[in-house]
UniProtKB/Swiss-Prot annotation:
Cofactor(s) the record lists: Fe(2+)
EC number(s) given by UniProt: 1.13.11.-
Family: Belongs to the carotenoid oxygenase family.
Record-given protein name: Resveratrol cleavage oxygenase 1
Organism whose genome encodes this protein: Botryotinia fuckeliana (strain B05.10) (Noble rot fungus)
Cofactor note: Binds 1 Fe(2+) ion per subunit.
Record-listed piceatannol binding positions: 144, 177, 404
Amino acid sequence: MAILNDPPSSTTILSLHTPDVPPPSKPTPATTSHPQDSRNPRNLTSKWPTAIDLAGSSLPCRLEGEVANLVVLGSIPPEINGTFYRVMCDPFVPPHPQNVPIDGDGNISAFRFHNGIVDMKMQYIETERYKLERQANKALFGLYRNPYTHHPCVRAAVDSTANTNLVMWADKLLALKEVGLPYEVDGDTLETLGYDPFASEGVESKTFTAHPKVDPFTDELVVFGYEAKGLATLDVVTYTLDAQGKKVEELWVKSPWCAFIHDCAITENWLILVCWCFEANIERMKKGGQHWAWDYEKPATFIVVPRRKSTPLPDGWKEGESRYYEWNNCMPVHTAGAWEGKDGKLYMESSRVHDNAFPFFPPDDGRMPNPDTKGDFARWEFDLSQPSGSKIQDPLVVLDIPCEFPRIDERFMTKEYEWVFLDVFIPEQGDGKSNIYQGLNGLAMHNNKTNETKYFYAGQDSHVQEPIFIPRSKDSKEGDGWVMAMVERRIANRCDLVVIDTRDFEKAIAIVELPFHIKAQIHGNWVGATETRGTKSLVREMEKIEISGKGALEPMA
């Protein structure tokens, strides 16, 4: 998720890009004049608006196709056997001029690894919105999550672009965006199979998180949806799907305000919902404004919910109760994991920005975030004996550097873990000014027990996207395996997929070279070959060839 831009040279400071956000009522011309540059030397007008996510290295890719046997530098271990699914925010038609970077159409890029060979396939998720706009060859949907700005003919359509995450569950590849329910996609062909694959489970929610969590010990998927009963409602549903996709738990709670609840964390018994300091407002939407506005008066808030009806409750808790806890105004962006301490408290780790990391959703007064805002990685502590609405203590800063997209060895999800992998900015290798995707030019491997951190530097004018972790074997020790991440080579205008052995983290053991640039992913996941049934080739296979006998050394007939 592209959120932070133009980092400074200090390891402790993270600057935010502050684009001009015009007032909703201001008319916008049908075409935009792009600044003169090498790509547009004649300063030609375009229906594509000038925006940070639609220019430079974030130029829309809009590609569908496949590449067999990508060029590999180095050697890929045969144990890496499966598919890296990633989804990009890639608008197919020129979007509404005032729309935001997180609302482009979902485009999947899949990389299948087998016996050291990597095949690639790209295809759009054919959402209802994508098909309507592709048929019309123009934008029909207006602002993000604001149907009042959509063309009247499509207001009854699902406006999800399914562009945020891809998760395999119950043998279904789910394309997710939290504004709606999942789309199901074929894991081999990438064809879109349908909307709401769990409809038969009877959960009366309009939404499904882009960050469901897998409990590897119970083989369950923990799900939530906010604004579950409609726009700007306070209703939040939490539920659990078993390995066959059957609902086994369901609990409804209320959010303290209509907050942006993007991510969560799970422990053995608890679900922690992370509320960002944005607020939805129906009246603002009806006037043509954005769904979200940052509120500097709101605290970062964490809703703690029992995962099951059978969850042992602390003293003072009632059956069906949830509690929320507050800190200061900030944005805990993505979680790594959470666990239950021996002291009875809950602990959760996340990346954190000390201001609004989505400046395209400013407060109603239009204020932009502080350009010197810090970013770091923090550990939060929750004492469940405290009443709802209590303020929690300041979190422990685990890594005091700009960072994002933390991942763990997810075989240990719900338990206290040792290793964290995440994108970081390495200032010793550059000033960060030439990077535009958060300036995150490296990866970190941090040990929570020893506090040791190892770094992988991607190179000058490169930026790194969200990492994934692949265990060396199903029973290997925690953190023993490989980390994989897409690296954008900004000057060359193309991308590489790097493979790093965690036993020697500072260098890649293999680089998969893409012959072109593709859009930055929002999120992605690794699906091992053993986790799917009947996996086919991702790309077109050659039929059996019979030798013709007409080669240069063969006699004339």
